[in-house]
Amino acid sequence: MTAHEVNFDGLVGLTHHYAGLSFGNEASTRHRFQMSNPRLAVKQGLLKMKALADAGFPQAVIPPHERPFIPALRQLGFTGSDEQILDKVARQAPRWLSSVSSASPMWVANAATVCPSADALDGKVHLTVANLNNKFHRALEVPVTEALLRAIFRDESQFSVHSALPQVALLGDEGAANHNRLGGEYGSAGVQLFVYGREEENEIRPARYPARQSREASEAVARLNQVNPQQVIFAQQNPEVIDQGVFHNDVIAVSNRQVLFCHEAAFARQKVLINQLRTRVDGFMAIEVPAGEVSVSDAVATYLFNSQLLSRDDGSMLLVLPRECQDHAGVWRYLNKLVAEDNPISAMQVFDLRESMANGGGPACLRLRVVLTEEERRAVNPAVMMNDALFTALNAWADRYYRDRLTAADLADPLLLREGREALDVLTRLLDLGSVYPFQQTGAADG
């Protein structure tokens, strides 16, 4: 059956700021406390979405979350009105205020793991929400992510959205950022590659930074998503590269159809994995980048592998890259050589995503890939699909509500909370989502 990959990109939230919340993510740590520009950030993301949609790649949006998230502060023991709580936490525990104000939901590669209908035992599209339990600010995302996905993929005859795994360390799950799908045509059965950093009875794990994804979680997600057991491979990420800042597999590898583009040091038993894939995937091609041409540290600094690999109508592939790759002489030299060689990657497109990149999120972090047949695509909430009208509306919305500068001190401003809630109220109507946010369900917008 004919199917296409649709990229659902996360909209950057109104409280996008640099707090260094993500240990193991070196860009996040390096840019801590710098001033951010939320309006520029959301527009950089919108420009990427629109450019790719105009080039013929189906594109949709996933909204941001309510931030600052007052219910989480109430759970932590802060009391009073919303304004009183903001004042208390800013004075007593500013780190918590930063955590509950994180715009990290924009990196929707961590929202869920997706199984196309061609791979599922029941013939449905499955999405399992990631629990993101390695980081407090990310674990907060889970309930609203589930509500948003149910509002977008609302036809239960076509889609099954599964709740996240239990919030325990053993079942740490980071979603599609640790998942690749390889195969031929999108509508044909493929091989799903689940990548983990640790497993309970395996002492091979990183020493410096945490391995966020467990094998136990990957296996559970594969079961929930009803992936045909004959179409699954579980592989361990190289713990040495996790210790160099590769906190998700999509920082060191990206796949599309029959191609796996990765660093030569990406996986723990890479030769074995490559041979497995060669056996299981017709026409499989591994493009392994040697350390002599691009070091792991340069790959992390430029997010070379946090790129999007997209299929064009002529069968060739487009590599969507952050500007940091172009700015790095060695990486750019390698890429120009790559597209000149005999392989499916024949073109590159560079985007300025520096607001997101400074927090450790490149093009691939910002999107959730969902393979859909034409019938399934018609069943998706049509209001989230990118087109000229939505692009214009979202830019006007951003101009109205987003600030052009934000520091950690601004997070305590009650006006920011009110601006955010008003903006999300408008957005849910624009995207026909219903009342997906807690403040809409409880009347908290009134104070």
UniProtKB/Swiss-Prot annotation:
Source organism, top-level taxon: Bacteria
Residue positions of the active site: E174, H248, C365 (nucleophile)
Pathway: Amino-acid degradation; L-arginine degradation via AST pathway; L-glutamate and succinate from L-arginine: step 2/5
Keywords from the UniProt entry: Arginine metabolism, Hydrolase
Catalytic activity line of the entry: N(2)-succinyl-L-arginine + 2 H2O + 2 H(+) = N(2)-succinyl-L-ornithine + 2 NH4(+) + CO2
Enzyme class, UniProt record, top EC level: hydrolase
InterPro entries hit by this protein: AstB_sf, SuccinylArg_d-Hdrlase_AstB
Family recorded in the similarity comment: Belongs to the succinylarginine dihydrolase family.
General function of this protein: Catalyzes the hydrolysis of N(2)-succinylarginine into N(2)-succinylornithine, ammonia and CO(2).
NCBIfam families: arg_catab_astB, PRK13281.1
Protein name according to UniProt: N-succinylarginine dihydrolase
